[in-house]
Amino acid sequence: MAAQVVYVAAKLGLADLVTQEPKTARELAQATKTHGPSLGRFLRALVGLGIFTEDEKGRFHHTPLSETLRSEPVRAWAVMLGAPFIWRPWGELYEAVVTGRPAFERIFGSIYSTIWPRTQMIARSSTPQ
């Protein structure tokens, strides 16, 4: 779960949006074109993980952890590691152990015909939307 939370935060570019001045969930929702109440709950999950802090006015501030998600190169890694081609095979681990067939190939086909195009897609999508 935490990996997906970090992935979404990186994909939305939240750490870059909470710059020198703290932002409210509403301000961040407008900047990211996301659903305000959902983003507010999501930001509180990030607070729970120590990635941001929230003050009494509902503004979100950086922590040392959130600073690592600002721009490149760490944000790109967080986006890549949260991508479906990384996490989906773990859901098939049991089948892989039982059958001996690699989970990645079961889901996506050949690693060589799948991984390189997806790597390019992720590189392009690491820029906040």
Where in this protein do the model-derived segments appear?
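Conserved Class I S-adenosyl-L-methionine-dependent methyltransferase catalytic core
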Residues: 1-129
